[in-house]
A protein has these predicted regions:
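Sec-dependent bacterial lipoprotein signal peptides
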Residues: 1-24
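Bacterial lipoprotein signal-peptidase II cleavage site
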Residues: 23-39
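An extracytoplasmic/periplasmic, membrane-proximal ligand-sensing/linker region
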Residues: 38-40, 45-53, 58-68, 75, ...
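Bilobed "Venus flytrap"/periplasmic-binding protein-like clamshell domains
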Residues: 48-74, 86, 109, 132-215, ...
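Sec-exported extracytoplasmic/periplasmic mature domains
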Residues: 74-78, 97, 116, 148, ...
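Acidic/His-rich segments in extracytoplasmic proteins that coordinate ligands and/or metal ions
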Residues: 92-98, 108-131
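A ligand-binding cleft/hinge motif common to bilobed small-molecule-binding domains
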Residues: 105-119, 175-181, 211-242
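Short beta-strand->loop
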Residues: 121-135, 236-249
Length: 323
């Protein structure tokens, strides 16, 4: 039976229990507040008074897609915000581990992997995926080309399967979980020339982005593939692909550096937890088409919300995300 949006991933991994911890924060500060750097001890990724923002490059135009949120954070905190460009998921994780970002918008898997590698980050909120939901979770969907003879994940054996990236939450880890549930072996048998994992029961192809995974399936470059629901839903509506399975995934975290001065962390936490779409629109920042199509606000969440992802990492070694 498919998961419903209100059925959190804790049920997927059995004993995992999600505890949403309310973080204490004071009221948001507007741009009229002093832009002075935070007081007390702490370190910044680049320079005092500048927040460096890292984001998952999972679709084309990621910088433009995140610009309104960056501008909103700058306006509400009084600090300068700079975007840290990364070419792929691995680069974002490396930047977080190296302490080159002060805040990060990512998938749950990148967050967990970065922490496991030593990144000093803590989630304070999770992003919503639709205007009509209050749960930040979303779905990893299994898709086939329109008219495909494949009707279940069990049919994927011996086929070419499109994934997004080995470090993708919904585009890889939760795709492997769905295949495992269908009876396929998801134990890696080695690595290809690019260092990506290989499997005995199917041929893995890594498209590099969610939209590219969908496009590869639609063009029949792959027999089956995985992508997040925000990409799949419009593709299904256009008649490009058919969704044959889906699995709930904890929403992508907005995380902040734990090394920032305490007052900066408090201010930034308050701003991120209050970053609704209405609040951003009302602030007067310029919106972009990519942003309004993909950002629907954030909900307060904490690190414990992602405990089930860590459990799934432990049960699927090919994910290479266990600590």
């Amino acid at each position: 039976m498919l998961s419903t949006r209100n059925k959190r991933i804790g049920t997927v991994v059995g004993a995992a229990i999600i505890t949403a911890v309310a973080l204490t924060g004071c009221a948001g500060n507007s741009s009229s507040d002093s832009a002075a750097a935070g007081s007390g001890s702490g370190t910044w990724a680049k320079t005092e008074g500048t927040l460096v923002f890292g984001a998952t490059p999972d679709q084309a135009g990621s910088d433009s897609n995140n610009k309104p949120l960056e501008d909103y954070i700058a306006k509400e905190t009084g600090y300068k915000v700079e975007y840290y460009p990364t070419s792929d998921y691995t680069a974002l994780i490396a930047a977080a581990v190296a302490g080159k970002v002060d805040l990060m918008s990512s998938g749950a898997l990148q967050y967990v992997m970065a922490q496991n590698k030593g990144a000093e980050l803590s989630a304070v909120a999770a992003t919503l995926t639709s205007a009509d939901v209050t749960d930040p979770g979303y779905y990893s969907e299994a898709i086939v080309a329109k008219g495909s003879s494949i009707t279940s994940l069990a049919d994927a054996k011996g086929k070419t399967v499109c994934f997004v990236d080995p470090n993708s939450t919904s585009g890889f880890l939760f795709g492997l979980y769905q295949l495992k549930q269908a009876g396929l072996s998801v134990d890696s048998t080695g690595a290809d020339a690019n260092g990506n994992p290989t499997f005995a029961d199917f041929t893995a192809y890594f498209a590099g982005a969610h939209d590219k995974s969908e496009q590869a399936v639609a063009s029949k470059q792959c027999d089956l593939g995985f992508a997040e629901d925000s990409v799949v839903t419009p593709a299904v509506a256009k008649g490009e692909v058919t969704s044959i399975n889906k699995q709930y995934v904890p929403g992508g975290p907005l995380s902040i550096s734990t090394t920032l001065p305490d007052d900066v962390k408090t201010k930034l936490t308050s701003v991120l937890q209050g970053a609704t779409l209405d609040a951003i629109k009302s602030s007067g920042v310029t919106l972009t088409d990519g942003f309004t199509k993909g950002y629907f606000g954030a909900q307060k969440e904490a690190d414990d919300y992602y405990a089930p992802v860590r459990d799934l990492c432990s049960s699927i070694p090919a994910g290479k995300c266990a600590k």
